[in-house]
Amino acid sequence: KSCCPTTAARNQYNICRLPGTPRPVCAALSGCKIISGTGCPPGYRH
């Protein structure tokens, strides 16, 4: 699961993922986090 700090970051992450870019790469580029659970940490609700 990915968690992003803003809607803009979420959009950037999603666009990054479209061609099949690995999740960790897109998370690093967009400022999002990849978590193993179901709940995002505070400040990463998008």
From Swiss-Prot:
The compartments listed are: Secreted
Per the UniProt entry, the disulfide pairs are 3-40, 4-32, 16-26
The organism's place on the tree of life at top rank: Eukaryota
Gene Ontology terms: biological process? defense response
Q: Which Pfam families match?
A: Thionin
Biological function: Thionins are small plant proteins which are toxic to animal cells. They seem to exert their toxic effect at the level of the cell membrane. Their precise function is not known.
Q: Main site of residence?
A: secreted
Q: Which organism is it from?
A: Dendrophthora clavata
Q: Enumerate the GO terms in the molecular function aspect.
A: toxin activity
UniProt entry keywords in alphabetical sequence = Disulfide bond, Plant defense, Secreted, Toxin
Query: Listed GO cellular component terms?
Result: extracellular region
Which InterPro entries does the protein's record reference? Thionin, Thionin-like_sf
User: In which family does this protein belong, per the annotation?
Assistant: Belongs to the plant thionin (TC 1.C.44) family.
Q: State the name under which the record lists this protein.
A: Denclatoxin-B
